[in-house]
Swiss-Prot record:
The gene is AKR1E2. It is an enzyme of class 1 (oxidoreductase). It catalyses: 1,5-anhydro-D-glucitol + NADP(+) = 1,5-anhydro-D-fructose + NADPH + H(+). Coiled coil: none annotated. Belongs to the aldo/keto reductase family. Optimum pH is 7.0. This is 1,5-anhydro-D-fructose reductase. Keywords: NADP, Oxidoreductase. Optimum temperature is 37 degrees Celsius. One of its GO terms (cellular component) is cytosol. It comes from Sus scrofa (Pig). The record marks K69 as: Lowers pKa of active site Tyr. Transmembrane segments: none annotated.
Length: 301
């Protein structure tokens, strides 16, 4: 597999009407890694942006690193390939560079993304992610995807996958929520010790939850010292931990700003101060799934 570019554009919560333009701006800026998922319901528009830049001759398909994710309602082995080809078709691609299991939990199959019972809790499927993984491996063998990985797996789940008998294709990354309020020190150290890279989603936190990470005084002070924005500090923080990072933006100015993180370095003290902000604050906790047998966040890490 090609090495995953360390910086990518996240497309989660990017409205279909604005994501095509965002992708085009990002490619012009220099982004080559795009993080997508069936769940985001905007892969079609992402694909339009990618295709436009290929047609213009700005990039070739082989210059790009495109990631998508298998949604929880498609964990049944017989559903994996059609889920993948659906994303490929939407993105207008012949292959994906990387395909991830979005969550370790299988949900009841069907058209509803979040099937819930009367009490509003997720309805599980009786699937096991080790079986789902075998269908993921088939996608690599068939050439539909170049590499496979996981997302939102805790270390016990990842260990179970890595120790699977007859594992044919290893997961290349574990994509997890990560920012200074949720530093994921133990999980990152575990993944890296097992040669599984880590990709950080929500690296800038999320003000929608009333958690204005970007306004944190410690981060602000470091930003002022370097003449950089708080967002640039948070992105650089992950890069210096050897963590791949996928900030989401549809704002052309911020798409550019988020990419300008290779011309400065955080000091050891900066890194220590940022790691010191950890408060185990998880923004993507998925509470309606917490009764699921494979819910990942009951384990310490």
């Amino acid at each position: 597999m090609e090495k995953i570019p360390v910086l990518g554009l996240g497309t989660w919560q990017a409205a279909p009407g604005e994501v095509t333009e965002a992708v085009k701006v990002a490619i012009d800026t220099g982004y080559r890694h795009f993080d997508c998922a069936y769940l985001y319901h905007n892969e079609n528009e992402v694909g339009v942006g990618i295709q436009a830049k290929i047609d213009e001759g700005v990039v070739r398909r082989e210059d790009l690193f495109i990631v998508s994710k298998l949604w929880c309602t498609c964990h049944k082995k017989s559903l994996v390939k059609s889920a993948c080809t659906r994303s490929l078709k939407a993105l207008k691609l012949q292959y994906l560079d990387l395909y991830l299991i979005h969550w370790p939990m299988g949900f009841k199959p069907g058209e509803v993304d979040l099937p819930v019972d009367r009490s509003g809790m997720i309805v599980a499927s009786n699937t096991d992610f080790l079986d789902t993984w075998e269908a993921m491996e088939d996608l690599v063998i068939e050439g539909l995807v170049r590499a496979i990985g996981v997302s939102n797996f805790n270390h016990e789940q990842l260990e179970r996958l890595l120790n699977k008998p007859n594992l044919r294709v290893k997961p290349v990354t574990n994509q997890i929520e990560c920012h200074p309020y949720l530093t994921q020190k133990k999980l990152i150290s575990f993944c890296q010790s097992r040669n599984v890279s880590v990709t950080a989603y929500r690296p800038l936190g999320g003000s929608s939850e009333g958690v204005p990470l970007l306004e944190d005084p410690v981060i602000q002070t470091i930003a002022q010292k370097h003449g950089k924005s708080a967002a640039q500090i948070l992105i650089r923080f992950q890069i210096q931990r050897n963590v791949i990072v996928i900030p989401k933006s549809v704002n052309p100015k911020r798409i550019l700003e988020n990419f300008q993180v290779f011309d400065f370095e955080l000091s050891e003290q900066d890194m220590t101060d940022l790691l010191g902000l950890d408060r185990n604050l998880r923004l993507s906790a998925f509470p309606i799934a917490e009764n699921h047998k494979d819910y990942p966040f009951k384990a310490e890490y």
